[in-house]
Amino acid sequence: MSTAGKVIKCKAAVLWEPKKPFSIEEVEVAPPKAHEVRIKILATGICRSDDHVITGALVRPFPIILGHEAAGVVESVGEGVTSVKPGDKVIPLFVPQCGECSACLSTKGNLCSKNDIGSASGLMPDGTTRFTCKGKAIHHFIGTSTFTEYTVVHETAVAKIAAAAPLEKVCLIGCGFSTGYGAAVQTAKVEPGSTCAVFGLGGVGLSVVMGCKAAGASRIIAIDINKDKFAKAKELGATDCVNPKDFTKPIHEVLMEMTGLGVDYSFEVIGHTETMAAALASCHFNYGVSVILGVPPAAEKISFDPMLLFSGRTWKGSVFGGWKSKDAVPKLVADYMEKKFVLEPLITHTLPFIKINEGFDLLRKGKSIRSVLVF
C-alpha cells in the first residue's frame, strides 16, 4: 500500500535536550511539500559533528533529530520535484546546491546560501518542520536529520546515486569521506611531492590522509593523541605518525624540526582552537597552507601571532571538502564503485539503529573510526 501523501509513523532517535542520551521514539513524518523529498533512510554514519550538538559545543534548538551522513531510497516526492523519483537511491546533502546563489554560481564556492549550518533554524526552508513526536514539533538538523527511518529534505539537498551502490558503505560520502578527501584534493589542492600534516585521525582525518596520498604527497605526517589510530593511518597512506604526548615541546616545533621549514599543507580535523593555531604555525612560513575542517566550538575565539600570516602563510576553511554537493556526490559514488578509493577501512562498526547510544559511546571513547547504523 502506497504511503505517498500520507503521514508516516516510524522510529527515530530524538534528542530532547543536550547532554542526554538519544531516546528511540515513534515520530510522525509529514508528506513532502512542493520541491521536497521524503527518504527512507537505510544506513547512517555517526559523525563527531552530531556529538557536538549533544555536548553543546554546537548550539541547536531542541528537541531535534540529528544525523547528516546517510543513504537511502526515495519514498515519495512533492510537487515540482524532477531530479529524483520514488525508488531512487540517494544521499541527503547537508550542504545543498540550489544552483542560483553566489556560492553555487562561483567556480570557487560550494557553501550554498540555502544551507542551515550557520542560521541553525532547525526548520525546512519554509520555516516549518516535518517531524512531530508526542504532539511536539521536532527540529531538523542541517537540512538532513538522518537518525530516523524516514526524513524529508529539500530537492536542493539530495543527490541521486548509482542503483548498485552499497548504501551501508557510500553513506560516508554524505559527510566524513567527502569532507576529508576533498579538503586535500579540492580545497588545498595538494601538489605532488609535497609534505602534509594531518591533526586528528578520526574518519575525516583519515580521509584527508587518503586525499593527500591520492594527490601525490611524498610525506604525510599523521598526528593524534590516540596511538591506536596510527596503524590505520599508515595503512591509508601516512608516512609518519606523531603523538604530541610523547614530547614536552609544542607540536608545531616538533613538526618544524621534522621538516626543516614546516609542512606545505596542514589540516586541522579536531575542532580545537589551540590545534588550529598549531596547524597554522606548523606550515612553511612563506607558502604553507593550513585548512580548518574541525567544527569550531560555539562562542570560542582564537588568538594568534599575525606575523604567522604576514610572512605568507594561507589559512582557510573547508566545508564538505569544497565539493559542489549535487554535482560531486554521484561522481564520488561512481569513483568508489570503480575502486578509485576505499571506504571499508573507515568503517569499524556496523550496528542496528536502536544501538545508536552505544555507537556514540564508541566514538567518545576513541574506539571507533566510523560506526554505521543500519535500519
Swiss-Prot record:
Enzyme nomenclature, EC number: 1.1.1.1
Cofactor(s) required for function per UniProt: Zn(2+)
Residues the record lists as binding Zn(2+) 1: C47, H68, C175
Residues involved in NAD(+) binding: G200, L201, G202, G203, V204, G205, D224, K229, L293, G294, V295, R370
Reactions catalysed: a primary alcohol + NAD(+) = an aldehyde + NADH + H(+); a secondary alcohol + NAD(+) = a ketone + NADH + H(+)
A Pfam short name: ADH_N
Protein name as catalogued: Alcohol dehydrogenase 1
GO annotation, biological process: retinoic acid metabolic process; retinol metabolic process
Record-level Gene Ontology MF annotations: all-trans-retinol dehydrogenase (NAD+) activity; zinc ion binding
Subunit field text: Homodimer.
CDD domains to which the protein is assigned, alphabetical: alcohol_DH_class_I_II_IV
Stated family: Belongs to the zinc-containing alcohol dehydrogenase family. Class-I subfamily.
Species in which this protein is naturally found: Apteryx australis (Southern brown kiwi)
Keywords of this entry: Acetylation, Cytoplasm, Metal-binding, NAD, Oxidoreductase, Zinc
Signal peptide span: none
SMART domains according to UniProt: PKS_ER
Annotated binding of Zn(2+) 2, by residue: C98, C101, C104, C112
Domain of life: Eukaryota
Modified residues annotated as N-acetylserine in this record: S2
Subcellular location: Cytoplasm
GO cellular component: cytosol
Cofactor remark from the record: Binds 2 Zn(2+) ions per subunit.
